[in-house]
Amino acid sequence: MKDIFEKYIQSIASKFSHEETSEMGYRTDFEILLKGIFESVKGVRILHDAKSVQGNKPDFVVLSGDVPILYIEAKDIGVSLDKIEKSEQMARYYGYTNLVLTDYLEFRFYRNGIKYEEPIKIANCNIKNRTVECAVDNYDHLIKTLIDFARSQKEPIKSGKHLAKIMGGKARRIRDNIKQFLSIESEKNTELFRVYETIKKLLVHDLTLETFADMYAQTLVYGLFVARYYDETPKDFSRQEALERIPASNPFLGHFFYHIAGRDFDRRLAYIVDELCEVFSHADVQELMGQYFKKDLWGETHEGPDPVIHFYEDFLNEYDPFLRKKMGAYYTPLPVVKFIVRSVDYLLEKEFKLPFGLADASKTTDGIHKVQILDPATGTGTFLTEILDHIYARFTAQGGRWPAYVHSELLPRLHGFELMMAPYTIAHLKLTIKLAKTGFTIFNRGKRLGVYLTNSLEDIGRQPELLAFDFAASIAEEAKEASKIKNEKPIMVVVGNPPYSISSSNKGDWILNLIKDYKKGLNERKINLDDDYIKFIRFAEHFIEKNKSGIVAMITNNSFIDGITHRQMRKHLLETFDEIYILDLHGNSKKKEKCPDGSKDENVFNIMQGVSISIFVRKEGNKKGLGKVFHSEIYGKREIKFETLDKSDLKTIKWKKLDYSEPYYFFVPKDFSQKEEYDKGFKVSELFIKYSVGIKTKVDNVSINFDRNVLSERIQNIIESKYSLQQMIAKFDLAKNTTWEYEKVLTIKDFDDKKITPYDYRPFDTRFIYYDNNFLSRSRSDVMGEFFQKDNIGLETSRNGDYTFISNTISDEHFASDNSFKFPLYTYEYDGVKQKPNLNGEIFRRFLEIEPKIEAIDVLDYIYAFLYSFKYKEKYKEFLKIDFPRVPYPDDGKEFNRLANLGAELRKLHLMESDKFNKLVTTYPESGNNEVEKVRYKDNKVFINEKQYFGRVPEIAWNFYIGGYQPAQKWLKDRKSRKLTNNEIEHYQKIIIALAETDRIMKEIDK
């Protein structure tokens, strides 16, 4: 064996001595070495360059017969394996059971994504001298370790996180392999393509190959997990056994798992699935879940959540965190679900005179059940499961009737729609098991569970009969049955937690036509009504409009209850419903929400967006006028909110009837008693003639940088290299689904250094941007052209008055809020030299009447001071949330000059032009590398790493907000892993002065 290693090292060293040798140049030598090592193991063969054969695989596969037992990924000699370990490629490969990472000299071992054994080096290299030095003592150690490692795979999984990591890795492999398979034409792909085309035609019209690969992989992997979770024979597990665990409640699921367990299942995927089954056979899934979820997410005194559901979210985090966020896959806490279910039950009894509430089995004159229930975004079936529990509680003394009741009175009217195949799978299994525990186990073709795989927001229409009885036909049947629910059932109750996806992909004609009712008469340039949750509310409202009575009860994003662009939506809901109940659960960390007493307010979900429970009631009979709105709210920590919800329903909550008014129809209490006085002032958008929102890049990683030279080199490289969009996405870490119009960049012939200019990215954070419309989504040149390479100054504020700042260069649309507007003080003539005030002449003349000897800058300073007044912001807070701020005219010249002088101080501070910066008040006492590692604040010190800190930093400066940002914190956090220059260290200390002085001047303004 020693001879084999010596020949290998000798050949490797010879090739390494030549700089032009690439990673591929060592492959043949390495394959010979592997064959020598495994020569003594019967039936083993080495597959070289597995990527080219099957795609998305490590470079070498060691097989025993046809079964892979070891995967090896090889990198070039001298490459940092530490960095490779953290790469996206390795994240995918960690789904392999036995994996080795090597640079041909060092070997690292991973079992199911976890490091295994210590690395072994058979040689060391000197990159500078291009030499290789043997480590002879490790030859035998590598042989033994590789053979033992390949043979032994049956180790128990000891933690839920480890299992989630393995499942995520396997799912990524399946997803990536399917994408690879379907990217080329092959007879082997016929069945996969058939399934894809059927789903696209009947379920998801805009389905891409990438999304299909994701759906397929998730359903397969997580479906196996759920089957294993309910496996009563824990010592073994296989695809065939998983098939036996699938209930007869849904032919679609049965066909899917029959497809997986069958002999014709794609062999290129089968070995991955079998690997996962092998892992499951050595994992006590129920025990792991029991350990993993001993503490639930909302306090130990409550009933814990379903571990299967919470594990699914952890699986998504490992599999694709971006997908979890995008799809809004958040488990609805049980107290929320129970509150909604109890409230609906109460309303059915009280308002609709149905004595059995949700359990009521009465029928219409057409013989159809009256209380038809739908969860249009059912997810994993949490709401339907709770409804089932709630109804079953009424049968405690009538257990003998239960099976017959379920068969004839419950299943025909309990419906759920779900687009994602994995949650859909979980919902079916979970509901089936829940029913089994109550004593109902008999399903047949006529009485299946009414949970369907469909896109609620798509109108697929009635489907023709299909005579085939295979997997594809079962998908068609699923679509047909879902279409019947949408078009024929008189849905009376709609419940749920619809997804929150601002960048919605649901853009079908049917739902967009319905949403038009929410946009009538709106004149905003940007109407933010495309979030999925709004579409689901409109979808639910549509059913009640058709039925002419019913209830919608959902927990959603709460932006619609007081958003300005949501005013027509609120009016339309008032036209449809008789009573609307809004239980605001707050929890909006974006708005820095706190309890009325100043204590912490938390969200019931792990998200930043606030939420509310909304219950819309349309009573039977003719609708007259607009409906009534009742409001209540719960502040506090999550546990407090859950405790309140747990013991309440609509009947016990204390509601306040709102006196809403046009044109806004707010669903929250508002105090507009100061309206007459407020309206006497002028709106900033009336004072400034020209203004716009800031620049939209869509690709900050490309167009913006801290360093002018770095940005210059990057832009030149992009222009010269003409990368493909996919190369740009990989190279600059762009969103995979970016809508950036990169093709415009490809038209640029020459780099223009003059287009690199300072850019106000965030408050006190000026960077550099390549200001070229081809690189930007929206350049806003009409307004930003007044700043580009020109001397100007501009007010920065927003429509909801949450911040005010000043800027003297072009700026970002997210400068200090979601939509930051810029108001230039001056505009330039066509010659680009002569400037004139960008002010409304009539308003400016009013100021001249009060104080004759003033200029445009003085008016700006006066406004600036007023917008920093605590008293002003508190007094007019409700008005400031609606539109651009209005500023009162001064009573006299004395008041004007006092405020203008204070505003001038603020302006100079915020532009870093104040004399206050001549003397620093903070310290920076410790020397070091100046790298920002971990930012923390303690005892008036702002640490940037373990050793170095800024001293004497006042707490008021550290916590000071400008819009949605805390500049003293964000400026440093945005520079994590960067080494601060001397100028940056000084600049940060000036930020602290500016913030502390701003607080002082704000108090002066209100004196």
Segments (PLM) and residue ranges:
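Metal-dependent nuclease catalytic cores in nucleic-acid-processing enzymes
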Residues: 31-36, 85-105, 430-437, 530-543
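Charged, often low-complexity linker/regulatory segments
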Residues: 1-40, 44-52, 223, 238-240, ...
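SAM-dependent methyltransferase catalytic region
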Residues: 47-52, 293-299, 303, 307, ...
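Short, basic/polar, glycine-containing "phosphate-handling" surface segments that engage DNA
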Residues: 2-16, 64-65, 75-215, 219, ...
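Conserved catalytic cores of phosphodiester-cleaving nucleases, focusing on short active-site segments
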Residues: 30, 60-62, 68-76
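Short acidic loop-to-beta-strand element that houses the catalytic metal-binding Asp/Glu
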Residues: 54-64, 612
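Preference for the N-terminal adenyl/adenosyl cofactor-binding alpha/beta module
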Residues: 153-386, 417-422, 454-460, 490-503
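Sequence-level detector for compositionally biased, low-complexity segments
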Residues: 505-514, 523-524, 542-1007
